[in-house]
Amino acid sequence: MAEQTLLSKLNALSQKVIPPASPSQASILTEEVIRNWPERSKTLCSDFTALESNDEKEDWLRTLFIELFDFINKNDENSPLKLSDVASFTNELVNHERQVSQASIVGKMFIAVSSTVPNINDLTTISLCKLIPSLHEELFKFSWISSKLLNKEQTTLLRHLLKKSKYELKKYNLLVENSVGYGQLVALLILAYYDPDNFSKVSAYLKEIYHIMGKYSLDSIRTLDVILNVSSQFITEGYKFFIALLRKSDSWPSSHVANNSNYSSLNEGGNMIAANIISFNLSQYNEEVDKENYERYMDMCCILLKNGFVNFYSIWDNVKPEMEFLQEYIQNLETELEEESTKGVENPLAMAAALSTENETDEDNALVVNDDVNMKDKISEETNADIESKGKQKTQQDILLFGKIKLLERLLIHGCVIPVIHVLKQYPKVLYVSESLSRYLGRVFEYLLNPLYTSMTSSGESKDMATALMITRIDNGILAHKPRLIHKYKTHEPFESLELNSSYVFYYSEWNSNLTPFASVNDLFENSHIYLSIIGPYLGRIPTLLSKISRIGVADIQKNHGSESLHVTIDKWIDYVRKFIFPATSLLQNNPIATSEVYELMKFFPFEKRYFIYNEMMTKLSQDILPLKVSFNKAEREAKSILKALSIDTIAKESRRFAKLISTNPLASLVPAVKQIENYDKVSELVVYTTKYFNDFAYDVLQFVLLLRLTYNRPAVQFDGVNQAMWVQRLSIFIAGLAKNCPNMDISNIITYILKTLHNGNIIAVSILKELIITVGGIRDLNEVNMKQLLMLNSGSPLKQYARHLIYDFRDDNSVISSRLTSFFTDQSAISEIILLLYTLNLKANTQNSHYKILSTRCDEMNTLLWSFIELIKHCLKGKAFEENVLPFVELNNRFHLSTPWTFHIWRDYLDNQLNSNENFSIDELIEGAEFSDVDLTKISKDLFTTFWRLSLYDIHFDKSLYDERKNALSGENTGHMSNRKKHLIQNQIKDILVTGISHQRAFKKTSEFISEKSNVWNKDCGEDQIKIFLQNCVVPRVLFSPSDALFSSFFIFMAFRTENLMSILNTCITSNILKTLLFCCTSSEAGNLGLFFTDVLKKLEKMRLNGDFNDQASRKLYEWHSVITEQVIDLLSEKNYMSIRNGIEFMKHVTSVFPVVKAHIQLVYTTLEENLINEEREDIKLPSSALIGHLKARLKDALELDEFCTLTEEEAEQKRIREMELEEIKNYETACQNEQKQVALRKQLELNKSQRLQNDPPKSVASGSAGLNSKDRYTYSRNEPVIPTKPSSSQWSYSKVTRHVDDINHYLATNHLQKAISLVENDDETRNLRKLSKQNMPIFDFRNSTLEIFERYFRTLIQNPQNPDFAEKIDSLKRYIKNISREPYPDTTSSYSEAAAPEYTKRSSRYSGNAGGKDGYGSSNYRGPSNDRSAPKNIKPISSYAHKRSELPTRPSKSKTYNDRSRALRPTGPDRGDGFDQRDNRLREEYKKNSSQRSQLRFPEKPFQEGKDSSKANPYQASSYKRDSPSENEEKPNKRFKKDETIRNKFQTQDYRNTRDSGAAHRANENQRYNGNRKSNTQALPQGPKGGNYVSRYQR
């Protein structure tokens, strides 16, 4: 019952799994197929035959038979498809093209489907089977129908045959079944392998094997398995015997030997049984235990494959892992490599999500709550990660050490190349899995290459090598020398090695038997497409092969050097390197030697081709090819890491590491390095230091990368459009550093870039050229060089070199590298071109539409650059080389219209050298034909013109003192501790100085004689027109050209012209008013040159005046010149444009040492400068103006009056006398006015003091205590003056006034002076609220909050726009400062010594109440003298002019004070009598700016004076006295005084002044002495004016 239920369930399940198909749902037996069965059956047979794999055929047959059985089960009699048709169709499927495998597949699927289709009709099935005889073989094997097809006799026979074949053993195939037989077989095999003559006994051993097999009925398959297993253990030494044994055995496929050297026959031939045995054994090895046995067995398999015993695919298809698994692993590995290639590319900050403020608290709580859970999750994640990583390692180990990958590796090692190449072509990404595959394939290629490499490269390198040393030993007591014996050992490692006296060679020497070496370079090119195309960039893992190919390429190009086929050969190698060699350099692991070998080949390529290869690698290959992408990313990250660690401390260690990385993979590592240089200043110097370890390949790529970055599309100027971008400057400095410190660095292409981009006026090219000249050439411009150094620079060679070192001009030290830099220009014939380009750019810079300041700066820069470049060329090129590389004088002048100063500057040194070396040389020969079109030679002598421009400062000036000074400096050096070599060097230097000094003196004498001879002619023709032409075309252009030329012009005109002509020239130059125009038009450097010229001229003229060479008329003329120059300078400085002021200051900076001389001129100049400073806002004008003013004022003490400079006329003398009298009268009048004002002020103050004393009577003050607070007319002492408003109005107060008011209150709150801050409040209601608040008892926190609320409300009533951000910032400051205040007791309820205490100890009143009526200096912590404190309110009108509207200090006595002397009048605080801090600070700043004559002269001093130590010991109370004598120097400094006053005030506040009541008499005595001790009479003397008294107080000053 249970069985029927189970069967019914299975039946129902099968129906669900395979539902009956209707013709409409059928995929093969559709209704159309059934209707046209005769034609469609043939099509179905063809479709079946077209299927290739067995899996596809099985699927197709399964579907077909399911549909057939479904159709047959319907029993449709009207159907055109009969059972016989189905049988015929099945026979056709089986017998189609007579393939046996078809019958097996069709039969098996027929049986399988018939067993699975539910509700099948057995009779119909049996009938169908009887009609298909071709399936009977399969039916008898597997189907239950076989019993229905046989009769009784056939069934009996079948049982007998089955019993005999299935259940009776004929051969033993298990070792345990016949251990004796298999044991003897193994023993025989071991004996055979140990037999040294086994190779000659192969037949005998094979016969014995057959004998054992027959004797013990051993199974042949198991016997073959045993032979293979045993032989694998002896494969190292016995592989030859093993192959010979198999060849003679029956197992050898003699009729169909496998051919594994042909792509088409890799799956044909061989012993299939042996292949299955080998595959099975390879799959059964335990990798952890049988690794060594597995490798030996694998090597045996490779030998069998190579000899054709088995075919490749019979092993490949059956060895683990399956291709699906391997491909999945490769895909995962590729994904990991992709992730690694993008590692560090994404910015983690850019991808990080910002956290909102609202969620921060929740997230923190969640972190706290879930801390334990997170820890557990983290531990579990780490555990899972470890397990996963171990699983990955296990999988990788299985794939690499066992199975298919291992098979490919060992096949390559044994020289079986074709199968491996076939697989790698089909699955090229297998190389990702194993690095060894590429190495082993490269080993094969290197074997093929070695004969060609030996024949083409130098083969005699090892002929001169010495033989190995002999070994000395004692044999049988005899000393003998024997050669070293090398022991050879066979190993399974493919690469031979030598260790000490042991040589390890590969055991299978026939591995290369099927390999044919290359015979020519063409063979190399042809076979590289086979081998290297598969290896790809992994060729970089075989650096020796890479080097050999590169050397062959070098030898091939050198062999064809000079032939017509050279270009063809180079083109072939360019393509070869581009495809095979260069991509492999990226995978070299820190091997700069290999890249150097590659570059030795690439050096023969044109740089355009090299740069194309570099660019292709950077932009395409490194992005498309995954191994290159990974390598590039790795190198880039490593370069960035080293750059971060690179510093001065680590440069010695990290530089070599960094250089090794860059020399190996420069394209990947130099780009981040150069970008780092662009962004940071200090990196450049470190990288330049590192570059000295680069190889040539890195230098070439570095030049390419620099050009790439220089031509990158980005702005070269900053946002202001004026200054160059920082990256341009940094790259320029870096390039210059490379050219200076790296002699192997080739910058020829950068020079080409400079040359080509200069045509477009590129600022980058200008910047690079400038840095090259400064850094490499060591050239320094002559701007800001003093006159002494200029003269030394134009002296003999020793002085010139010394002066150059003083100004940091290192051209002499950099001669070698500067000559190398010059060679880059000469190689491209670019010297004259660059000179003309820079000259043209200079002209264009003057015509641009920019601010004059910018144009001037650019013009100076371009002039300096051109001058420096010419100096570099003249220093490096001498004689013939200079003449060959620089355009002739005439061509520069006539064709290219180079200006006269530049043309002569270029050729002047060459002309001097030619004249000195060749006496017959004539300058006319050189300049003959030169057309000076801008010079009217009819009005000026050509001889004068050419002589003026040809000569240099060296020729016309000789100063012996310069040579003597240098000689004395060298002679004075302490030579006692010097070495002999250094002493000798100093002696030689002194000798050179003497020799060059004599030579210079001779040249100067020769020039002087020449000029003296020519001057006779020049002085004859010296009219006004000639002078103007001379000034216009000679003096002015050369003065503006350079500092040395400016001095030359001065020396020349003094040397070449007589005094009268000299005066005429100078008179025309000065009185023509060209100085002002010149200074406006010229640049800053040219203004300095003009200053040098006038400095020397005026210095010489002044020297002539002092020496008496000038008469009165000449002195008067000189004064007129000084006046004209002063007038022009003042006019220039009075201009509002920038150029006039700046150039005027620059001119005066040089001239001010000798000019002006007259005191009035100096005063005029510095007065003009001071007037300019009033409204000047430009810092580059203010700073030099201030310095110039100081210098001019310092010269006033040595300045001359006019009568000291020259004789005055009678009219001038009378005017001087009248002026002095008028000045004296003005001075007397001012003194009288001041005295009168002081007297009026003093009387006014005395009257005020008297009225205050009367009002401060104690009874009256108590009665009117509260009323005094609200009185609006108290203390009013001026009539008809407006009353101060009781309440500020926002409409009346300006914003600046409000902010100052807020700052004042904040100042006192910050220093905890709350009462002072309250006293500044201008609102009576708010003042009352604050006073009331200070009386209440409350916590300090509430007190501060309430105070803040009142102040903030008060401030907001003063301003129209409370939302103003500056005002809000002031309120924030108020909130911070309010935290500093503490509770201060109110005066009437607390200590008698408080801020506003009314009755205190007062001093006895003097006659004039001069010392009474106010708080004592010690008694008021608010006391301060006239203050310079700018934090006080600045918009409150003077108290002396208005009645007091603020709340006054309380006048009622303190409750705690018992002393009440009614005879003493209370000293009220007044505007001029001992004011407190709060009252004094409320005065206007303008009051303190008044003259001393306008202020009240009777004031208390700023600080109290404490008595000496004796009085302090006698009485603890220190009565402070006010010193009436001269104030100390410290009192003149408000800041120090203020600080000291605060210290004394704090000290007094800490004392207990209640103790002073016990010493009243003494106290009053001290007071009387203090106030009246210095009086000489009962009447106080009125203060004296500036002329009165011996002492002038600080207030009168």
From Swiss-Prot:
Q: What are the record keywords, sorted?
A: Nucleus, Transcription, Transcription regulation
GO MF terms held by the record = mRNA binding; nucleic acid binding
Reading the lineage from the top rank, the first entry is: Eukaryota
| InterPro entries (alphabetical) | Tho2, THO_THOC2_C, THO_THOC2_N, THOC2_N
Locate the compositionally biased regions of type Polar residues: 1419-1430, 1568-1582
What the entry lists under Pfam families is as follows:
Tho2, Thoc2, THOC2_N
Stretches with biased composition (Basic and acidic residues): 1458-1490, 1500-1512, 1522-1545, 1554-1567
What's the miscellaneous note?
A: Present with 521 molecules/cell in log phase SD medium.
Q: Which PANTHER family match?
A: THO COMPLEX SUBUNIT 2, THO2 PROTEIN
Q: What's its job?
A: Component the THO subcomplex of the TREX complex, which operates in coupling transcription elongation to mRNA export. The THO complex is recruited to transcribed genes and moves along the gene with the elongating polymerase during transcription. THO is important for stabilizing nascent RNA in the RNA polymerase II elongation complex by preventing formation of DNA:RNA hybrids behind the elongating polymerase.
Query: Quaternary structure?
Result: Component of the THO complex, which is composed of HPR1, MFT1, THO2 and THP2. Together with SUB2, TEX1 and YRA1, THO forms the transcription/export (TREX) complex. THO associates with DNA and RNA in vitro.
What name is this protein filed under? Answer: THO complex subunit 2
From what organism does this protein derive?
Answer: Saccharomyces cerevisiae (strain ATCC 204508 / S288c)
